[in-house]
């Protein structure tokens, strides 16, 4: 039996994933009972004498471990949320990471809490708006803690964030932390500054993101361009970057004589160096899931070298995943975690396909007894082999990550394979020259050498930028699928793969058939999603925004703060919305002006009492009525009438609507047939109404 540990880890991760997603549908218990009963019946009745019996036992034992880890994680989250939800507390915390906010002098931050009301505590919280601070700083202030909304709860728990923290008052900097994470965060800042000095803003932001993981200097235009070109994974320090740095740096630094060390000493030294470098990369890049997974594989490989264990990529991958989810089983739901593992599995599959195809070609050539090839023919064949390897691995990695992207509601690019074959080879020289420029920039005496590395890295990054900007302008650069349709397509492709494997269909027949099927599915999905109007509630349950979208345009009815604003921008990004035709600010007392870009703006707080504004945009027609203590917005879209309220509104006659877009405001002045809501806990809702009867989105073809 091969790879029993890998099968054990697959059982653990699979059950953690099932436990995280299925409870939301209310079908977890019957599904689990059916799964375990069916598995035991199949193993006991049909596979007792085959090697699959051992695999089944490993799978069940792994599932038991996954159940234990899931139970301990859920108990930990419930304990924290029951203790602090709804409280205003004094926190002392270390700033783990920051991103830009929408207001001057403010940042969005993730905090690791050290004390709550001067009592020791250990938890992570996210603050949407905090006075300016930097990663590695220790801060103090009074915050209001609350549980994340249902729509963002799973993503927050996957990041290890138990509660949201709203800053109230008393902010103070307590100095710099001395933890390993804080020290590496300051090192990241120094390396990023040394790397970017003397460069243009575009290449500098890309290099800082690729080499040090600092994405704060990356423009929104380049982010969108790389996503459209299918190269967004290049801008995140991932397993590919760790493999290049940990696998190639030592080989380039050691002289040839050292590379030929006899015995096991040389391999142990390299393994130790790679493990230390991987640890440093994990700290510098902020403990991202993809880097943690790759570093875990490097550490396990190094351990295998020291204990004379044979390396196995799949086993290392599985063990790294279990170790990453040991303290937080919800981490398996992180998109970065899933994309990283899917990409590695696809890369390994592509490598196996390349290896088998090369072996088959060599056997065929040996049978024909061809004479020795000339020099130029050998070079041409070597170039063709390298191109085939790049295309095959890129194709397998793209096919492996495609289900994750579409099932998680993210857009994907049709040109990921083209970009991978054309410019992915630039990543290694960019990383090596960028790393050289960053390290040399820390020593002022080495400024000339740093400038040489900097110019080379800047030139290569500029080439990559121009390619991304060019490809992102092609039609179909970003496409988005409905989740249900994406699930059907993924099941169809998985079934075809299984049939091809079972019937031993040749690769040159199976691969084009799969690509043709995937292409037809993409074309059909794109055609079906054209001219479909979607009405969604996003953001905080206390102040949700309304997003009405069709194709690449949208209308936004905004209310709330930074949390809602971030959710709106995430939704626009996932839906590939490029034009906001109208932005209606429903806030009656806004603390600041709304800064999101839009062709037309309406601010309710500037309207006269009982005045009405009507606007007709692409996806919808919106009518807004200002009252003394609130406003009413009526939306006509896709043959339906929607109404949403902000504040309190008293009308002479009730407003008729097909659907109420719910908020904490009491809808006494609205008659409706259905509800779209982010919460089932609003005070005005009937007690018999459960969360299973609610949804937060509506879609219909116009």
Regions found by a protein language model. Give the residues of each.
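Transmembrane helix-bundle segments that form internal channels/tunnels in multi-pass membrane proteins
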Residues: 1-79, 88-92, 253-261, 265, ...
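Membrane-interface helix caps and helix-loop-helix hairpins in membrane proteins
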Residues: 21-25, 282-291, 306-311, 327-337, ...
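OB-fold single-stranded nucleic acid-binding module
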Residues: 97-178
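Membrane-interface segments at or immediately adjacent to transmembrane helices
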Residues: 72-129, 142, 526-595, 601-603, ...
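Core dinuclear metal-dependent hydrolase active-site scaffold
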Residues: 203, 215, 325-333, 469-504, ...
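Alpha-helical transmembrane segments of multipass membrane proteins
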Residues: 17, 276-283, 299-306, 322-330, ...
């Amino acid at each position: 039996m091969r790879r029993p540990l890998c099968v054990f880890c697959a059982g653990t991760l699979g059950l953690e994933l099932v436990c995280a997603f299925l409870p939301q549908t209310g079908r977890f218990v019957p599904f689990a009972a059916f799964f375990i009963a069916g598995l035991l019946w199949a193993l006991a009745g049909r596979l007792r004498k085959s090697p699959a019996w051992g695999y089944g036992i490993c799978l069940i034992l792994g599932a038991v471990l996954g159940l234990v880890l899931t139970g301990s994680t859920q108990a930990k989250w419930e304990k924290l949320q029951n203790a602090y939800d709804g409280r205003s507390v004094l926190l002392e915390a270390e700033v783990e990471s920051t991103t830009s906010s929408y207001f001057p002098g403010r940042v969005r931050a993730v905090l690791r809490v050290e004390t709550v009301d001067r009592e020791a505590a250990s938890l992570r919280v996210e603050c949407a708006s905090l006075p300016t601070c930097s990663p590695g700083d220790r801060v103090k202030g009074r915050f209001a803690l609350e549980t994340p909304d249902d729509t963002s709860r799973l993503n927050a728990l996957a990041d290890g964030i138990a509660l949201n923290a709203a800053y109230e008052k008393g902010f103070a900097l307590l100095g710099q932390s001395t933890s390993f994470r804080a020290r590496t965060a300051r090192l990241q800042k120094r390396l990023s500054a040394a790397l970017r000095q003397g460069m243009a803003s575009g290449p500098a932001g890309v290099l800082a993101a690729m080499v040090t993981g600092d994405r704060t200097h990356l423009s929104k235009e380049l982010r969108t361009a790389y996503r459209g070109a299918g190269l967004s994974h290049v801008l995140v320090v991932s397993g590919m970057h760790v493999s290049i740095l940990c696998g190639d740096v030592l080989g380039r630094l050691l002289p040839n004589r050292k590379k030929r060390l006899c015995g096991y000493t040389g391999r142990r030294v390299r393994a130790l160096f790679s493990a230390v470098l991987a640890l440093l990369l994990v700290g510098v890049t902020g403990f991202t899931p993809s880097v943690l997974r790759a570093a875990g594989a490097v550490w396990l490989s190094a351990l295998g070298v020291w204990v004379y264990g044979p390396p196995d990529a799949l086993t290392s991958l599985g063990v790294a995943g279990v170790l990453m989810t040991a303290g937080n089983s919800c981490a398996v739901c992180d998109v970065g975690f899933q994309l990283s593992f899917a990409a590695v599995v696809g890369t390994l599959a592509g490598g196996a396909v390349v290896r088998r195809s090369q072996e088959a070609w060599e056997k065929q050539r040996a049978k024909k007894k061809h004479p020795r090839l000339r020099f130029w023919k050998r070079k041409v064949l070597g170039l063709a082999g390298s191109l085939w390897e790049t295309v095959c691995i890129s194709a397998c990695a793209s096919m492996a990550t495609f289900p994750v992207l579409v099932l998680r509601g993210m857009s994907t690019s049709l040109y990921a394979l083209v970009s991978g074959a054309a410019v992915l080879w630039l990543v290694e020289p960019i990383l090596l020259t960028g790393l050289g420029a960053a390290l040399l920039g820390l020593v002022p005496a080495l400024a000339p050498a740093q400038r040489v590395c900097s110019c080379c890295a800047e030139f290569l990054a500029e080439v990559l930028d121009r390619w991304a900007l060019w490809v992102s302008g092609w039609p179909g650069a970003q496409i988005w699928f409905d989740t249900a349709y994406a699930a059907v397509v993924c099941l169809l492709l998985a079934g075809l793969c299984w049939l091809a494997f079972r019937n031993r269909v040749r690769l040159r027949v199976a691969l084009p058939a799969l690509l043709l099927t995937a292409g037809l599915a993409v074309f059909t999905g794109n055609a079906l999603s054209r001219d479909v109007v979607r009405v969604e509630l996003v953001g905080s349950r206390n102040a949700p925004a309304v997003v009405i979208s069709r194709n690449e345009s949208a209308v936004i009815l905004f209310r709330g703060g930074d949390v809602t604003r971030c959710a709106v921008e995430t939704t626009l990004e996932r839906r590939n919305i490029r034009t906001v035709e109208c932005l209606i600010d429903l806030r009656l007392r806004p603390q600041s002006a709304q800064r999101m870009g839009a062709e037309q703006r309406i601010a309710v707080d500037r309207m006269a009492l009982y005045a009405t504004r009507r606007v007709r945009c692409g996806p919808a027609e919106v009518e807004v009525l200002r009252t003394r203590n609130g406003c009413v917005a009526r939306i006509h879209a896709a043959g339906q009438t929607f109404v949403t309220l902000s504040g309190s509104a008293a009308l002479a006659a009730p407003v008729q609507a097909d659907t109420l877009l719910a908020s904490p405001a009491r809808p006494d002045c609205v008659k409706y047939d259905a509800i779209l809501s982010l919460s089932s806990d609003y005070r005005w809702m009937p007690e018999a109404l459960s969360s299973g009867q609610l949804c937060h989105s509506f879609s219909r073809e116009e």
